[in-house]
A protein has these predicted regions:
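N-terminal Rossmann-like FAD-binding beta1-loop-alpha1 element of flavoenzymes
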Residues: 8-35
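N-terminal FAD cofactor-binding segment of flavoenzymes
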Residues: 46-101
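Conserved FAD/dinucleotide-binding core of flavoprotein oxidoreductases
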Residues: 202-255, 276-287, 299-302
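Conserved mid-domain beta->alpha element of the FAD-binding
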Residues: 258-321
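Predominantly flavin-linked oxidoreductase catalytic cores and closely associated redox partners
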Residues: 121-236
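Long, low-complexity C-terminal extensions of enzymes
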Residues: 298-427
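Glycine-rich FAD pyrophosphate-binding loop
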Residues: 27-50
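Conserved N-terminal helical subregion
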Residues: 5, 90-148
């Protein structure tokens, strides 16, 4: 990196989840004797706090930043997340759980509250040199000597500005497996009293349910290839007949990945939605963001080259895609155009992956102990076992021989609650 300034100057742009996580991670990993950090955001640009769920990786970032459980519950309006409950995924089981395991939990949080609290908290972290800059980014340039943002020079910039990045707007790769690309999102103003994320398959896609302390967020996701916004709103109303969902917000996105993480000049990177977005299934977007955050920290600390960083992000993107395909391969309880199309695409995509039925059979014959190291994308063996049983994949019996003989005890009603339908969650 170019270090012509007295201190290495870094800017993070944006205060969404990615901007918060990147700034918090920098606060932990940079030696501020040598770095200065500006966190730039436009106070006139609202953050749409839909309610967000995470994997177990994100709470570790918050813990290292001295966030307490009390802050999580009170400041972020959050709740603990022990896993994901699936309804109507696959052809066999009406309901199954993906449990994170003993001592592992994600969180549900209000994304706008995370932004507000982190902005207030960040400048008070001891031993840092972080300045919050409240202004709209009107100009940005990248060159071999650094970035210029609104006339100020920086050695490195992380763009967390959202779906529309500030530079390289066309440098993306379209998804190989188009799944859902739109959602109608409804806030139900009653506390969510459960500790898992809900993934409820419907004929046009699937719906997520996220519990916060003061409300619930329900998102009816669908593919614009098969379903219109009006049809999606009708579908949401059908699933929630006693709610007035007319206030539900419509959002859409193009499933895609960034073609690189760090630009050719080595001075600009993207994170969060600016680095690409597939869909919200299993909170994998948050995991992808956390991985990018770590790679960028390694890069600015000279622990990772530009080439390795870019290779790592491509690998992370492939893992995300593989994880999605594994969920969709068995279809759902619905014989509909969307599910038939996406299941066929997912099966075809997975034929070349390590978790294919033939590959697992080969591992079992040649070296059974390798089953323990089997993984697909971001899912380890114990995750695959739960998903394979719940989805009833062809590999479930082989996987089941090697781990979690007491699998059926996972996700007991005593821990998870006995909700058996959307109606049970809305009581």
């Amino acid at each position: 990196m170019n270090t012509e300034f007295k201190k290495i100057k870094i800017a993070v742009i944006g205060t969404g989840t990615a901007g918060c996580l990147q700034t918090l991670q920098f606060s932990q990993e940079l030696n501020f004797e040598y770095f200065e950090l500006d966190w730039i955001y436009d106070p006139e640009t609202p953050i749409f706090g839909i309610g967000e769920a995470t994997t177990p990786h994100i709470p570790q970032v918050l813990r290292r930043s001295k966030f307490s459980t009390d802050m999580l519950f009170n400041e972020l309006k959050g709740s603990l997340k022990y896993g994901v409950r699936f309804f109507n995924w696959g052809k066999k089981n009406k309901r199954f759980e993906h449990d994170f395991g003993v001592g592992q939990y994600g969180i549900h949080m209000d994304t706008s509250a995370l932004s507000t609290f982190t902005l207030k908290h960040i400048e008070n972290i001891e031993g840092t040199n972080i300045k919050v800059v409240a202004e709209k980014v009107k100009s940005i340039e990248s060159s071999p000597n650094g970035c210029i943002v609104n006339g100020r020079n920086y050695n490195f910039v992380v763009d967390c500005s959202g779906y529309e990045p500030l530079l390289y707007k066309d440098e993306y790769i379209d998804s190989e497996i188009p799944t859902v690309d739109s959602a109608v999102i409804y806030r139900r103003m009653k506390p969510g009293k459960w500790n898992h994320t809900v993934h409820f398959a419907h004929e046009n896609g699937w719906m997520f349910g996220i519990p916060l302390r003061d409300r619930q967020t329900w998102g009816y996701t669908f593919s614009s290839k098969f379903t219109t916004e009006e049809e999606a709103r009708e579908g949401l109303q059908k699933l929630m007949p006693d709610e007035d969902v007319s206030t539900a917000r419509y959002v859409t996105w193009k499933p895609r990945f960034a073609s690189f993480l760090i630009d050719d000049n080595g001075v600009y990177a993207r994170n969060g939605n600016a680095a690409g977005f597939m869909e919200p299934l299993q909170s994998l977007s948050g995991l992808h963001t956390e991985q990018i955050t770590s790679i960028i920290c390694d890069y600015v600390n000279d622990d990772c080259s530009k080439q390795l960083g870019n290779e790592a992000i491509i690998a992370s993107e492939r893992e995300w895609l593989e994880g999605l395909a594994y969920h969709y391969q068995m279809g759902s309880a619905f014989d509909s155009p969307f599910w038939n199309d996406v299941a066929e695409r997912a099966k075809e995509f997975l034929k070349s992956k390590q978790c294919s039925e033939k590959d697992i059979e080969d591992i079992e014959k040649e070296n059974p102990k390798d089953i323990e190291r089997l993984a697909l994308g971001c899912f380890a063996c114990h995750d695959l076992l739960q998903l394979s049983h719940g989805l009833d994949t062809p590999t479930k019996d082989i996987l089941g021989k090697w781990k979690f003989a007491d699998f059926n005890s996972y996700g007991t009603d005593e821990l998870w609650g006995a909700q058996d339908s959307i109606e049970d969650y809305l009581k």
